[in-house]
Amino acid sequence: MQPSALLLLGPTASGKTASALALARVLPIEIVSVDSALVYRDMDIGTAKPTAAERAACPHHLVDIVSPEESYSAAHFRRDALRLIGEIHARGRIPLLAGGTMLYFKALRDGLSDLPAADADLRADIDAAAARLGWPALHAQLAQIDPDAAARLDSADAQRIQRALEIVRLTGRPLAESYARREAAALPFRMLPIALVPSDRAVLHARIEQRFDQMLAAGLIDELRALRARYTLDATLPSMRCVGYRQVWEYLDGGDDYDTMRFKGIAATRQLAKRQLTWQRQFRDSWPGLVELDCLRPDLTNAVNTAAARLLTRSRHAAH
């Protein structure tokens, strides 16, 4: 019988952590984080990392596994997640892959494309253009040659804009076409996806604002000060491009005052949620069996528990 893996995906501030922990109280699960920020050690406040007590209540994987000085890619995630899912099944437990990094979910489901390697000369040209014109201008260039790719990227996301321009220029194809040319081996387990979606975007936005203010009150600025003192960091590292840290970095460097930093942090988090929901709409059309739940419903944890139980039961019946 093919084993199953539960998936819980949703935008930032949609209640994924609380729902995952509630599920752990009724099912023998282990949580595999699907979050490109939670992998970094010592970045706790700005990533809304599960607390020590929450992590003690249920095994968590792919949290605190790399230094903020290092990079962690979708390829790393797919390799690690497949290994962990196999190990969790071997222990007789159920993997729950929970998070909001939609590219990681897609990489797991579809495999990874055979993309061209980094080209040092082309990267140098792109970086020189960015230094002269700014990354928003390069984002606009990307929008002209590959509007779909540009729509998925923040205009200040230097790392991803650089890579997108590089791939499009090296291949002569839109990014989506390059990603479609992939070798995806059949997965040795069934994926049972649950997606959290807000019925009212304004309520999610209010939650995002409240949560960013809570992060500031909890010491996000001091956390980044400590990170800069402990590690050799710069603003271009993937860890420091994470929403919240990027805006506080500019504040600490004197580029923005406190109110501007707060405004930018909230706005960037809302933009992140918008991109996550764009991914989820695409999943809705391409992922048979995906269950959508309103993340604003007062009984969300019960609804997630019920949906998970139904998916697991259906999967068991389908296997016989």
Swiss-Prot record:
Molecular function, one GO term: tRNA dimethylallyltransferase activity
Reaction it catalyzes: adenosine(37) in tRNA + dimethylallyl diphosphate = N(6)-dimethylallyladenosine(37) in tRNA + diphosphate
Gene3D superfamilies: 1.10.20.140, P-loop containing nucleotide triphosphate hydrolases
Family recorded in the similarity comment: Belongs to the IPP transferase family.
Organism listed in the record: Aromatoleum aromaticum (strain DSM 19018 / LMG 30748 / EbN1)
GO biological process: tRNA modification
The protein's Enzyme Commission number: 2.5.1.75
Site (Interaction with substrate tRNA): 101, 123
Taxonomic superkingdom: Bacteria
Protein name (Swiss-Prot/TrEMBL): tRNA dimethylallyltransferase
Keyword Transferase belongs to the record: yes
Binding site residues for ATP: 10-17
Chain residues that bind substrate: 12-17
Region annotation Interaction with substrate tRNA: where it falls in the sequence: 35-38, 159-163, 241-246
Keywords, ordered alphabetically: ATP-binding, Magnesium, Nucleotide-binding, Transferase, tRNA processing
EC class: transferase
Pfam family, one: IPPT
Quaternary structure annotation from Swiss-Prot or TrEMBL: Monomer.
Functional summary from the UniProt entry: Catalyzes the transfer of a dimethylallyl group onto the adenine at position 37 in tRNAs that read codons beginning with uridine, leading to the formation of N6-(dimethylallyl)adenosine (i(6)A).
HAMAP family xrefs: IPP_trans
Cofactor list: Mg(2+)
InterPro entries: Dimethylallyltransferase, IPT, P-loop_NTPase
